[in-house]
């Protein structure tokens, strides 16, 4: 079992708006002067875009038939944040997980992030990474509203367990005529003095087309953010050789590392929408959204392999007298007898594993939808749509050079560690001195510059890796409006088909010999591959270092590509296809006392995975197939206590399926992280059944109070097991992978999640007005 403690220092920004311009034709025409107004009198009219957007969001939330929370763009179409994760993170019950300080994943009410689905205009979109929907690749500039549904209804896919984030794209019909909106801004990151830039533009117009009307909207956005980040990470483990009294509760740091980043992140988006309303009862819409997230990252990684020689410690269950010993016969790792503890101690002559990595990471989503809404006869409505989405996750690495300590103990560092402060991974480095009669080790002179230690080049890896997911969706919904039990009701019957295919293509050039290094033009001495650049971060590390030269890495990579051939990583290549046939029945009834929504969704899921596997020493294609039928009932009741207060009760269900890479019938090897991950095509989805009880009070002039409780019972919880691989079956190219960390997905029994949520949004004006402000 492995545990990780980490700390990350991120950028803070000082930003300012350069310009923001809006032109709205036909919206703000100057009113004609009335006869009783003097010609020299000036009339001033005002608008409050932010207040208007908040009011619109609260109105949508109040009128919703299930539990939702909404972020709406202001009257000129702006959300206050750069990406969807940041914008949604302002809403109650929405937490964001960050990478390098930037909001990336969304968790609803404390649930796992893969329980949250992403959709554009109601169509679920597969993230480039898979079921863990990433929201940092989606600029908020494309959205007019963000609707977060916390209670699942039958028209939502069954994989929506904790909720859905629905990005409502802009339409020309959001505006009364010609509309132009542009924004530009810049700022500076204080850590590392890095610049950031932002800009967006939206143009739309409406045109008469016979008896109907056509609306056209196009938009684009760009965001760039330079960053310097620094961190430390500590991975803990149980050590089998530590058998002394109290060992059951002791977890030792197997390694500690610093990751020091220089990076630039960019977002682009382009969207277009064509809406045609031939008459008041028919609408046909073509929508397209293309987003790109690019991360150019240079990472200097120093990993101190504290458990490098843990087998030197003899397992002994007897109690010992604890006494400081600065000349042990072993490394001192996990040895309580010499005075070492989990959080303080000294380890003698251990390995430094240094990585210099230059990445050109890129993710994109290209989603296209053709949809139509048609009202016919009396009370009948037909909605149809077709969607194609292609998501790409380009994980390629320009180059990664590995520099490792030699096997000679006296050429390796002695490391003194102090982890008592959880915010600092304090280290001190020393030379290692070997004593004789018997052989013992002690700390020599203190070392500040880590690059004075011998760390010859051990490998150079160039990776080309692209994961492509192609998804097709077809949906047909027939609705009937009618009277029901004294109220107005809408009954819906729908069918939906989804097919998603994820294909992984991965190959690499891996150089490990001196002759290959010479051909590629990379020096074996790190100091000849580094810059004379002082540390740009601020985290205290206990040593100094030199950044690697990114220009030299690009040159070496280009030379290696010309002289060596990429070899497919067959163990990491797979093709997984998922088909979902779904049907649902639901009813929505509105009464004087409130409303009710209920129904059932049935899904038949078919999975097929193809990969290269090794069976009895023979490698070849392996195909695994599975199928299952799942039923998802739900019921939501909304009671109007009065015109301003609502009580919401709901029961809902869902099923979180394992991610596509977890369903593959093979294993994936990552030499950089020394990890192996395996697929499990037979793993079952985790089923969730939940209840919610919420009270909402909408207050004047504008605001609301909300409090509620929620609970979910989960069956067949998806559990990621982690252990030491313990086999030489995957050893190759003189690389021993038996000690790598192996992880795989499995079902781990039942569980539950429950909690309490409260939120308040109030206007300060009634109080500030009384103060004369």
Where are these regions (language model features)?
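Transmembrane beta-barrel wall of Gram-negative outer-membrane proteins
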Residues: 192-346, 353, 361-371, 633-636, ...
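Extracytoplasmic beta-strand/coil segments of soluble accessory domains associated
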Residues: 85-124
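Surface-exposed extracellular loop regions of Gram-negative outer-membrane beta-barrel proteins
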Residues: 177, 244-247, 256, 265-289, ...
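N-terminal periplasmic "start-of-domain" segments of outer-membrane beta-barrel proteins
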Residues: 43-77, 105, 113, 123
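Flexible glycine-rich, low-complexity coil/linker segments exposed to the extracellular/periplasmic environment
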Residues: 316-350, 411-459, 505-572, 726-746
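Gram-negative outer-membrane beta-barrel transporters
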Residues: 711-713, 731-773
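A beta-strand signature from Gram-negative outer-membrane beta-barrel systems
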Residues: 91-92, 125, 138-183, 229
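Structural signature of Gram-negative outer-membrane beta-barrels, strongest in the C-terminal barrel
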Residues: 277-279, 289, 389, 467-475, ...
């Amino acid at each position: 079992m492995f545990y990780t403690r980490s700390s990350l220092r991120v950028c803070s920004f000082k930003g300012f708006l350069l310009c923001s311009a809006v032109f709205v034709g036909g919206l703000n025409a100057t009113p004609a002067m009335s006869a009783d107004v003097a010609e020299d009198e000036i009339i001033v009219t005002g608008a409050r875009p932010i207040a208007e957007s908040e009011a619109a969001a609260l109105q949508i939330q109040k009128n919703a038939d299930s539990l939702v929370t909404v972020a709406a763009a202001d009257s000129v179409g702006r959300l206050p944040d750069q990406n969807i994760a940041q914008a949604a993170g302002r809403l109650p019950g929405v937490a964001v997980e960050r990478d390098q300080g930037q909001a990336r994943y969304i968790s609803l009410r404390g649930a796992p992030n893969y329980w949250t689905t992403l959709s554009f205009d109601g169509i679920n979109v597969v993230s480039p990474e898979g079921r863990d929907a990433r929201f940092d690749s989606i600029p908020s500039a494309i959205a007019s509203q963000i609707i977060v549904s916390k209670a699942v209804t039958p028209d939502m896919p069954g994989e929506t367990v904790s909720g859905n984030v629905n990005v409502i794209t802009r339409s020309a019909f959001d505006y009364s005529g010609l509309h132009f909106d542009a924004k530009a801004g810049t700022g500076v990151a204080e850590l590392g003095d890095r610049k950031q830039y932002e800009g967006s533009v939206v143009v739309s117009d409406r045109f008469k087309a016979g008896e109907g009307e056509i609306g056209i909207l196009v938009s684009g956005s760009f965001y760039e953010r330079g960053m310097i980040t620094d961190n430390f990470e500590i991975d803990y483990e149980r050590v089998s050789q530590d058998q002394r009294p109290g060992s059951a509760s002791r977890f030792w740091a197997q390694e500690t590392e610093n990751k020091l980043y220089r990076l630039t992140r960019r977002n682009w988006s382009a969207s277009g929408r064509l809406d045609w309303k031939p008459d008041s009862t028919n609408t046909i819409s073509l929508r397209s959204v293309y987003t790109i997230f690019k991360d150019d990252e240079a990472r200097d990684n120093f990993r101190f392999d504290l458990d490098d020689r843990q087998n030197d410690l003899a397992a002994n269950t007897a109690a010992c007298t604890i006494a400081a010993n600065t000349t042990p016969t072993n490394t001192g790792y996990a040895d309580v007898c010499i005075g070492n503890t989990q959080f303080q101690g000294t380890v003698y002559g251990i390995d430094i594993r240094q990585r210099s990595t230059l990445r050109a990471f890129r993710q994109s989503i290209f989603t296209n939808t053709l949809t139509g809404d048609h009202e016919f006869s009396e009370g009948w409505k037909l909605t149809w749509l077709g969607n194609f989405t292609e998501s790409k996750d380009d994980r390629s690495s320009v180059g990664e050079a590995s520099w490792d300590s030699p096997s000679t103990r006296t050429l390796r560092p002695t490391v003194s560690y102090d982890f008592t402060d959880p915010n600092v991974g304090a280290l001190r480095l020393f030379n290692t001195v070997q004593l004789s009669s018997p052989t013992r080790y002690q700390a020599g002179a203190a070392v500040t510059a880590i690059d004075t230690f011998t760390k010859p080049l051990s490998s150079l890896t160039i990776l080309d890796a692209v994961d492509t997911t192609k998804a097709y969706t077809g949906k047909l919904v027939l609705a009937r409006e009618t009277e029901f039990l004294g109220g107005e009701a809408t009954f819906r019957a729908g069918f939906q088909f989804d097919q998603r295919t994820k294909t992984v293509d991965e190959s690499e050039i891996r150089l490990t010999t001196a002759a290959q290094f010479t051909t590629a033009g990379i020096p074996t001495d790190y100091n000849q591959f580094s810059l004379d650049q002082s540390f740009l971060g601020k985290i205290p590390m206990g040593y100094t270092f030199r950044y690697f030269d990114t220009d030299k890495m690009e040159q070496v990579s280009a030379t290696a590509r010309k002289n060596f051939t990429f070899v497919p990583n067959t163990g990491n290549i797979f093709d997984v296809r998922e088909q979902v046939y779904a049907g649902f029945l639901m009813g929505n009834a509105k009464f004087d006392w409130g409303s009710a929504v209920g129904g059932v969704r049935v899904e038949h899921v078919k999975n097929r995975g193809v990969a290269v596997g090794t069976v009895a020493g023979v490698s070849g294609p392996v195909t695994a197939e599975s199928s299952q039928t799942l039923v998802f009932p739900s019921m939501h009741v909304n009671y109007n206590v009065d015109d301003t207060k609502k009580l919401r009760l709901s029961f809902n269900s869902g099923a979180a399926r394992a991610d596509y890479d977890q369903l593959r019938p093979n294993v994936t090897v990552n030499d950089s992280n020394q990890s192996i991950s395996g697929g499990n095509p037979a793993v079952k989805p985790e089923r969730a059944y939940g209840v919610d009880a919420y009270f909402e009070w909408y207050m004047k002039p504008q605001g609301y109070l909300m409090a509620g409780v929620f609970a979910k019972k989960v069956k067949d919880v998806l559990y990621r097991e982690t252990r030491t691989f313990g086999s030489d079956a995957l050893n190759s190219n003189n690389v021993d992978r038996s000690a790598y960390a192996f992880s795989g997905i499995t079902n781990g029994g039942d569980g539950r999640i429950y909690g309490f949520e409260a939120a308040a949004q109030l206007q300060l004006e009634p109080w500030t007005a009384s103060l004369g402000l």
